[in-house]
């Protein structure tokens, strides 16, 4: 299959699945992990691969990605044994504001509430285990159905708490744009 240039593709798995040209930046995963920082701010000019880098990190660490081994098989991170063993072992929340283009405050709030509702719905399986009180399950479904948009302020923190209870591991949160 002829390799193509992946213009505009910001999803690591799509680039790998399409066998598109890719400059291996997986060494960033090791550098970032070994830094031990609680918070990392990635600043680069537009079109410098920030979103693709976040996608790569998310897909490397995420418990929910099924083909991690295959995606990263021919990359530099495969050679870093102490980091390689961490692949697919963390809950990951990923949020992007790139589609939030509203100019009115109330519309912006509703749009963000919708994005967070999508994230909550992806993790609906959390409500099936006995890790939440009935009140917490109500809270979860209120966020998932956008019934309480004013609660979005603490919703990511609450979701990360639920994920921590479920997996017993700290949660990686990626926020883009």
Question: How should these model regions be labeled?
Answer:
Residues 1-79:
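Walker A/P-loop-proximal flanking segment of P-loop NTPase domains
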Residues 8, 13, 62-126:
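P-loop NTPase motor core
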Residues 20-21, 104, 108, 112, ...:
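Phosphate/oxyanion-binding active-site loops and adjacent basic polyanion-contact surfaces
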Residues 38, 91, 168-172:
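Loop/turn-to-beta-strand initiation segments
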Residues 41-43, 53, 94, 172-175:
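A structural signal for short, well-ordered beta-strand segments and their strand-loop junctions
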Residues 56, 67, 113, 117, ...:
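RecA-like P-loop NTPase motor core of helicase/translocase proteins
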Residues 89-96, 137, 174-177:
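Glycine-rich, often proline-containing surface loops adjacent to acidic residues and nearby aromatics
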Residues 122-174:
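Mid-core helix/loop region of P-loop NTP-binding domains shared across ATPases and GTPases
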């Amino acid at each position: 299959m002829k390799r193509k240039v992946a213009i505009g593709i910001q999803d690591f798995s799509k680039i790998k699945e399409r066998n598109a040209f890719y400059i291996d930046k997986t060494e960033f995963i090791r550098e970032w992990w070994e830094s031990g920082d609680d918070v990392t701010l990635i600043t680069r000019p537009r079109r410098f691969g920030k979103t693709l880098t976040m996608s790569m990190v998310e897909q490397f660490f995420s418990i929910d990605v099924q083909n991690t081994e295959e995606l990263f098989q021919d990359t530099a991170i495969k050679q870093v044994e102490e980091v390689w063993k961490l692949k697919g072992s963390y809950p990951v929340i990923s949020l992007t504001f790139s589609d939030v283009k509203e100019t009115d405050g109330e519309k912006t709030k509703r749009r963000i509430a919708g994005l967070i509702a999508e994230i909550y719905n992806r993790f609906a399986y959390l409500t099936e285990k006995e890790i939440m009180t009935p009140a917490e399950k109500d809270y979860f479904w209120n966020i998932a159905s956008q019934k309480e948009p004013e609660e979005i302020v603490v919703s990511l923190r609450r979701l990360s708490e639920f994920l921590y209870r479920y997996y017993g591991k700290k949660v990686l949160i990626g926020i883009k744009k």
